[in-house]
Amino acid sequence: KTTALALLTELSQAPIENINIKVNLEEEKRNGQFILHLFGEKLISSAHDVSDGGIALTLCELAIVNDLGFMVTEESTEYFFNETQARYIVTINPLKEKQLISLAKEKEVPLTKLGVAKGTNLCFGQNFLSLAHVNDLYHNVISNMMDSKNNLN
C-alpha cells in the first residue's frame, strides 16, 4: 500500500524528515473513546480519522462531501501528510468550542484548532485550491486519463 507520505516523498524526490509514525494502542483507545463520548454528548457534528492520507487528504475529502471549503493556518507539509494514528478531524458548532476545549483538557486529549470550514476554496495557509477544481479532479481524474490515452491512439 502506498501512503500519501510515501507518494509525496517520491514525487518531491526528497525525504520528508522528522515524521514520527508510531502506533500507540493506549492513545488509539483513549482518543477513540473520547470521540465516541463527544458524539454521545452531541458536542461534535462529525469526526474523521486521518491515518489514511493525513490531514490534507482528510480535509479535502470532507470539503468535497460537504461542498464547503476551509481555511487552516498551518503550512507545514510534514504536518499535513503525517499519517500518525489516533488523530481525528472533528467539526463542531462554534458555540460548543469552549465546552470541547474544556473536556479535552479534563480527559487529557490533545486538541488543535486547525481553522474554519467556509467558502469555496481549500486554503492551507497562503496556498489554496478551488473546491471546484479539487472536486473535478477527485471525480474525473481516471476518466480524463482514459480519454487522454484514447486520444493518443
Task: Kindly label every feature range from the protein language model.
Residues K1-N20:
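Short, acidic (Asp/Glu-rich) active-site segment that either coordinates a divalent metal cofactor
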Residues E17-N20, E27-N153:
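Glycine-/charge-enriched secondary-structure boundary and capping motifs
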